[in-house]
Amino acid sequence: MSIEPRATADLVDEIYPDVRSCDLQLQNYGGKIMFAGPVTTVRCFQDNALLKSILSTPGEGAVLVVDGAGSLHTALVGDVIAGLAADNGWSGVIVNGAVRDAAALRTIDVGIKALGTNPRKGTKTGEGERDVEVSFGGVTFTPGDIAYCDEDGIVVVTP
């Protein structure tokens, strides 16, 4: 399902006071700054095999929310995984953790928000959970929610 991106500040003005906005100051790394879509979730710690597997499937405009427990020790997304997301029709990836290949990520047509960068790559054991509620930045992301992202932040709406 494709969702039209919207300015988060305008969206907040419309739905206030029932606002769910992420308090983390995630940075933009992808080629798209404004993106939106239905939420798919994954929880993984310093291991990106599961999220690589998910992003290798058709995204149909969805946003993958990755709870990496805020770890900046290893990157969960780099240019290869971001390329998979773009090639498979994902609108974006929100990472509560680190990314790498920051210069290359800016050239890939997918939204990417993350805490920061680290050139160290993650392990590839496949550990983690998919399609579970994940919480960070004062927001609980539930599969099927709609995430709207832009320069001002992230707003989550339950359809």
UniProtKB/Swiss-Prot annotation:
The keyword Metal-binding applies. It comes from the Bacteria. The keyword Isomerase does not apply. Gene3D superfamilies: Ribonuclease E inhibitor RraA/RraA-like (3.50.30.40). It catalyses: 4-hydroxy-4-methyl-2-oxoglutarate = 2 pyruvate; oxaloacetate + H(+) = pyruvate + CO2. Its EC number is 4.1.3.17, 4.1.1.112. A divalent metal cation binds at D101. Divalent metal cation. Pfam families: RraA-like. Keywords: Lyase, Metal-binding. One of its GO terms (molecular function) is 4-hydroxy-4-methyl-2-oxoglutarate aldolase activity. Its cofactor is a divalent metal cation. One of its GO terms (biological process) is regulation of RNA metabolic process. Substrate binds at G78, D79, V80, I81, R100. Homotrimer. NCBIfam families: NOT-MenG, PRK09372.1. Belongs to the class II aldolase/RraA-like family. This is Putative 4-hydroxy-4-methyl-2-oxoglutarate aldolase. The lineage of its organism: Bacteria, Bacillati, Actinomycetota, Actinomycetes, Mycobacteriales.
